[in-house]
Structure formats: structure tokens, C-alpha cells
């Protein structure tokens, strides 16, 4: 019997939180492989806040996923068949913008076989050596340009991006304060990731805690969340501060217009540099970022956690973990067994 593909199809635009019926898991035959293509088997599927944006009919940095189309997403996959000279079966690739599918036919020229570094697990290519690591690296180093002695605040600090941002800032000699949603996460940030302080926004007064941990004000705010927490940080920014705007996860499931930051005028008074960015803007520079992150990772200067859910069928139900703050580190779905190193 011929092997079947499995794909999550977008059936309707979600309103608010993702619910049953918005996506449907379907089976179907494998598409014929064309010259120049490779067939990949998905190993790890990345779950990211941007997945929710792509489901909505909004004017984003990419067109929304069409109704009836396979859900867009990326991950790590193994080449199982190749009609492209540069890749062979057994190679591991980062799929880029593929789909939530067990098998995909992808253009070989857009892919590169990942090097296997000694002592580095494959999951590192979903974290510090993947898109989340590149988001942290370029957002901080290229936009914020941290200097030793500066104070850096990171929201969603125990997430895949935030945890990398804080550790890179520490390597640069900064004081780093993270904001997260549980005592467990705050403990990990200070005891494992090396943050100077961590604030549990669910149990602490964020403004008072920022005053305590940032007595000299805030030089860099790496923003992942938005909303009321962002307001508290903006109100404490220093002159000529920098604010890479990476995400606004608190707003992605909103069903009504979201009010703007009440402390917005402080960006003017403090002459803050505020810049939104998308990691794909930096794609041509990924080799530079991966090389540096790999050096830090292999030197033990970067720690990372993975939150792994098993089974492609569990992908939609697991996406909510991001918006509920339940994940520690990089959230992903293991779709199939990874090959032995």
C-alpha cells in the first residue's frame, strides 16, 4: 500500500483563540517529485506566535494562509528522495516556509544540508541555531547594539527568543532583567540562563519590580509581548534607549481593537529608537549569526530548553501553550523519529 501524506488544512479563519474546526488533518497521496525538488519527511515542526498571524486575514509581512490550503510552518526534515544534485537521502534540512505536513516536496536550491556539530543535538537547529536564535541575535546585536554596563529588559524571557536574547546580552556585559509568567521560569532564568533578575508578572507588581531591579533605568527593551507590561517598561526607558520590536504576542488572539501604549509619549521624550523587524529580513546574514551562536553554544555560554509535543495530530492544540505562557524554551512538535547522529 502506498504511503500517504498527512497535512493540517486551514478550514476557516479563527476568531480569538484557535478552536476545533479551524484546522482539519487530512490524508492524501504523495505528490510526484519534479526535477530540482527533494521530498522531505518532517522530524520537528516549529510552533511560533506567527502561526496564529498567518491564519488571520490581516495585512502582514506575508499573505495569510488561504482557506483550504495547508497550514504554513517550518521545521527540520530529512530528505527521503531527491531529484536535486546538491542533496541526497539522509540529509537534514531546515524546511524554511513549508507546511504542517508529514511529507513536502521542496525546491532543492532553497535548502542546505545542516552540519552536525559534535555534542550539539539536532534540536539546537530549532533553537539557538535556528530562526529563533537568529531572531534573538540580529534583533539584539544589529538593532539594539548593546554596550557593556547597560541594562536590558526582555519580555517573554523564558521563551525561545527571549531566553537567547538575555544570554547574548550577558555575553556582551549587560545587566539583564527578564519578565516571565511563573516562579519556575524565573528560577530557570536566574539559575541556569544567568539573568541578573527575573520578574513574575503574574504574582509581582511589574512596575515596582522594574524600579527595584533597574535602578538606573532601562537602556534596551527587547519587546516580545506588548500590552500593559510593555507600558511599564517604556515608562522607565533611558535617554537614547533602543527597543527592538520582535513580537506582540498578547494581542494576536484579540477579538477587539487593542489600545496603544499609554506611555507612548515617553519614546519621544527619551529619544528611543523603536524598530520592528522580522527575522526573514536577515536571511542573507544567517551564516554569520549561526557561526557566532554555534561558538557560544559549544563554549557553554548559551543554554537552551525545548518543549516537545509528540505527534503531528497534536500541533493545533499545542499552539495555545505559547499564548498561555506554558512553554519553557522552544516549543516544537516531534512528527517522526530523528535519525541517529
Region spans (language model):
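Glycine-rich beta-strand-centered segment in the early N-terminal region that forms part
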Residues: 29-47, 55-99
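Short, glycine/polar-rich helix-capping loops at beta-to-alpha or helix-loop-helix junctions
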Residues: 101-102, 181-188, 206, 258-264
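N-terminal Rossmann-like NAD(P) cofactor-binding module of classical short-chain dehydrogenase/reductase
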Residues: 94, 153, 199, 221-222
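C-terminal capping/lid region of NAD(P)-dependent oxidoreductase domains
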Residues: 2-5, 301-308, 316-341
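Glycine-rich phosphate-binding loop and adjacent beta-alpha segment
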Residues: 228-302, 335-341
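NAD(P)H dinucleotide-binding glycine-rich loop of Rossmann-like/cofactor-binding domains
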Residues: 71-78, 89-156
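Short amphipathic alpha-helix with an adjacent loop that forms part of the alpha/beta core around
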Residues: 205-215
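Mid-domain Rossmann-like dinucleotide-binding core that forms the NAD(H)/NADP(H) cofactor-binding site
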Residues: 126-204
